A protein has these predicted regions:
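A glycine-rich (often HGG/GG-containing) alpha/beta subdomain
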Residues: 1-134
Length: 134
């Protein structure tokens, strides 16, 4: 797996909070790009950061940003989570901005179940656990 994937991991908007997950080898570079080079902070801890659209520099939202280094993440890969406001416009703007970065990174939207598949393939969950999530 050389590509990096992203998806809305929480329920569909509108909601109070939306969780957008990014997993793969370029997830930390994407985090740096969207936080305009702000200091990452410590792994596994939430940090308040502005999410900035790399295309035009517009602030998309203020979000809690977390990163989980491989191999200790849920997928076994470098993983980033953005906990942003769950309104439809904000979620769509963030997902659209990620899509626009697919030319800069080996980045694409995750297929259904792909985070689980990567967790299984990287030994983070066994077959019984994977089937339990289906």
């Amino acid at each position: 797996m050389t590509d990096t994937i992203y998806a809305l991991s929480s329920g569909r908007p509108p909601a109070g909070i939306a969780v957008i997950r990014i997993s793969g080898p370029q997830s930390l570079a994407i985090l740096d790009r969207f936080t305009d080079g702000a200091r990452r902070g410590k792994p596994r801890r939430a940090h308040l950061r502005s999410l900035v659209d790399p295309a035009d520099g517009d602030v998309l939202d203020q979000a809690l940003v977390l990163f989980f280094p491989a191999p200790g993440s849920v997928t076994g890969e470098d993983l980033v989570e953005w906990h942003c406001h769950g309104g439809q416009a904000i979620v769509r703007a963030v997902l659209d901005a990620l899509q626009r970065q697919s030319g800069q990174f080996a980045l694409r939207e995750a297929r259904p179940g792909e985070f689980t598949r990567r967790a299984f393939e990287n030994g983070r969950i066994d077959l019984n656990e994977a089937e339990g999530l289906a």
